[in-house]
Regions:
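Structured, acidic catalytic/metal-binding patches in enzyme active sites
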Residues: 2-217
């Protein structure tokens, strides 16, 4: 896009994934990056202060804990599920419901090979811009995105957390206490076949996208 005053904006869209034959970029695209005054992303991956601020937003201040913000039954369900993932209660209790829900949702779509993949498009462009000494900008901040989650109502955060648990737990092997805790928050439909089928379909769709990213031949 050209604003008529000689300022040209190039928009490179992606869903943070790539494909095997994408690199190296076409020379025309490389030239656009290397001749830019600034390269802007959704977030600035290089801003460590923002990353630390976002991390701090996910935990409670001293004297407060997760147990004070969700039902006792759901709290026990979270502690038990987290223990299976190698997290002790002391660690889990520091995190807010939305932060744990995000983590559980991510875990539901990852496997042991997910971290072995080549960088995605945005990280590639970011590295190229930094190496060329080009300024990095961002449309949003980590604090802005964190604030969206942090201002969710307590009721919504509890539902979000219960929903995250539902993604990572096997409904056929969980304890009755955990089932009751999730049902109390999510309702009787949570364990109905139609709901479980919808959850599995969602996970399958995300898994297919992740497989394409890992295989890099989408």
């Amino acid at each position: 896009a050209d604003n008529g005053r000689g300022n040209v904006l190039y928009l490179l869209g992606s869903i943070h994934t790539d494909r095997n034959n994408l690199y190296p970029f076409h020379k025309q695209l490389r030239d656009v990056i290397l001749n830019a005054e600034q390269v802007s992303f959704e977030l600035d991956f290089n801003d460590t202060d923002q990353l630390l601020e976002f991390a701090a937003m996910q935990t409670y201040p001293a004297g407060d804990s997760l147990a004070n913000h969700i039902s006792p039954a759901l709290y026990q369900a979270v502690v038990q599920a987290a223990a299976q993932l190698g997290m002790d209660e002391g660690t889990v209790s520091q995190y807010k419901p939305w932060a744990l829900a995000n983590s559980f949702s991510s875990l539901a779509t990852l496997d042991e090979t997910s971290s072995e993949n080549a960088m995605a498009i945005d990280l590639y462009v970011n590295a190229k811009a930094i190496n060329a000494g080009i300024g990095i900008g961002a449309v949003e901040t980590y604090a802005f995105q964190g604030q969206i989650f942090d201002t969710l109502s307590p009721e919504y955060q509890e539902q979000y957390l219960a929903g995250g648990l539902l993604l990572i737990l096997d409904p056929d092997s969980i304890s009755q206490e955990t089932r009751d805790a999730l049902t109390q928050v999510l309702g009787e439909d949570a364990f109905q076949p139609a709901t479980q089928e919808a959850i599995q379909a969602q996970l399958d769709q995300i898994s297919a996208m992740m497989d394409s990213w890992k295989a890099r031949d989408a």
